[in-house]
Amino acid sequence: MKKFMDDNFLLSNDTAEELFHHYAKDMPIIDYHCHLSPKEIYMNKRYSNITEVWLYGDHYKWRAMRAAGVEESLITGDANDYDKFMAWAETVPKLIGNPLYNWTHLELQRYFGVDEILNKESGPSIWEKVNKCLAQDDFGVRELINQSNVQVVCTTDDPIDDLSFHQMLVEDDDFSVKVLPGFRPDKAIEINQEGFIDYVDSLEKVTSHSTKTYDGFLRALKSRVDYFHQNGCSVADHALNTMMFTETTKEKARNYYEKAMNGQKLSPKEESDFKSFTLVFLGEQYADKGWVMQYHINALRNNNSRMYNNLGPDTGYDAMNDEVISKPLVNLLNELEKKDRLPKTILYSLNPNDNPVIASIIGSFQRGGVPGKLQFGTAWWFNDTKSGMIKQMQTLADIGVFSQFIGMLTDSRSFLSYPRHEYFRRLVCSLIGEWVHNGEVPYDLKSLGEIVQDISYYNAARYFDFGLLSDE
């Protein structure tokens, strides 16, 4: 029997252990997609207790607590922070098999030196130990990032954001980690959502372009791409909950934009025409700038209307969608490829049934001279588990080129989430170790170690324009 979460946690055999400890463990982290606050990084936010770090915005934990029968007052309600923490401590033992169980203990070990198992009995002492650490001078969020060996943090930012905190971080010589903006124009794409007209008005205010017309709207978006580019952005991201694409014309998109601006809802076909033309336009801008484009596909969001009305979005009431993505996704990518303006692209689906679909689609759009131009993104959200990560990597290896994989990201709102990179790297090493053990791959530690380091760091460092490998 193995010890609980020891140095060889998740490592399947001796080869996996060698690969992790000698090649993967100490590689820097490139967190190319997350939801951290640039303001909190600039201000070097400090936390007064562990509940603030763990439970104030983590809908993963909120869902688990609800499923365990915890009252909402102890999750998002007005209970005090100690009681909320103890509710989480009592929930954790019930989560065996869930990555939250391992992530929780990894975070306790790595940041606070706590090796105890979190439960109802240990909760009070762990509360005291962790809060004592958080009170120390070296436990601001900057120190947590530095302690995690992070080189780049890419935040998620709306086109109308002024990026002032990113700008101040560039000028701050006391913090060497690159904190770069990520362009997320969802509110400009979701034309049927309530608030679209108000958002477009806000877009006009931060640009010199009137958004009363569709042409002006596109010029305003382009100007924000330019502004983000000037401020170090080289990554865009889209939440495409429903994957749709129709071959259309600018005239049709213009007509439907005007219809929406007059307060009318668009039909599904009209919405698809608007989104299709606008997404192609934005993809062209990204290609011209040398950006990386990310599509997060097939999420079914805000399913519980009663709780959505009480708490709003991103509070733990989302699920996997099961809509067909292959044809609209291929047609969208092909439209950009026909114009020779398909940017580097990362595709994620929340539905694991789409894994072989995406892995095969990216192979249709690869191009010589750009290794892994299209990427099958790492297991996302509900798939961000041991089995989900292994399935994603195994599918990529089955159909594509595993050695070109750009690896892990946190996609997190927590400054304690970086051990997820360690969790991922352990699984990479374990998977390769099993291939060696089964005689599928030769035991060539140098070659395999290079692949592990590439997936852990170097592939992403080469893929993104972050200026990390100036000697290459």
From Swiss-Prot:
Q: Which domain of life is it from?
A: Bacteria
- InterPro entries named in the record: Metal_Hydrolase (IPR032466), Uronate_isomerase (IPR003766)
GO:BP terms for this protein? D-galacturonate catabolic process; D-glucuronate catabolic process
Whether 4Fe-4S counts among this entry's keywords is no
- Enzyme Commission designation: 5.3.1.12
- Which pathway is this protein engaged in? Carbohydrate metabolism; pentose and glucuronate interconversion
GO MF terms held by the record: glucuronate isomerase activity
The catalysed reaction is: D-glucuronate = D-fructuronate; aldehydo-D-galacturonate = keto-D-tagaturonate
Q: Which UniProt keywords apply?
A: Isomerase
Q: Which family does it belong to?
A: Belongs to the metallo-dependent hydrolases superfamily. Uronate isomerase family.
The protein's matches in PANTHER family, at most eight in alphabetical order, are given as: URONATE ISOMERASE
Question: Which HAMAP family does this chain map to?
Answer: UxaC
The name on file for this protein is Uronate isomerase
* Organism field: Oceanobacillus iheyensis (strain DSM 14371 / CIP 107618 / JCM 11309 / KCTC 3954 / HTE831)
User: Which gene holds the coding sequence for this protein?
Assistant: uxaC
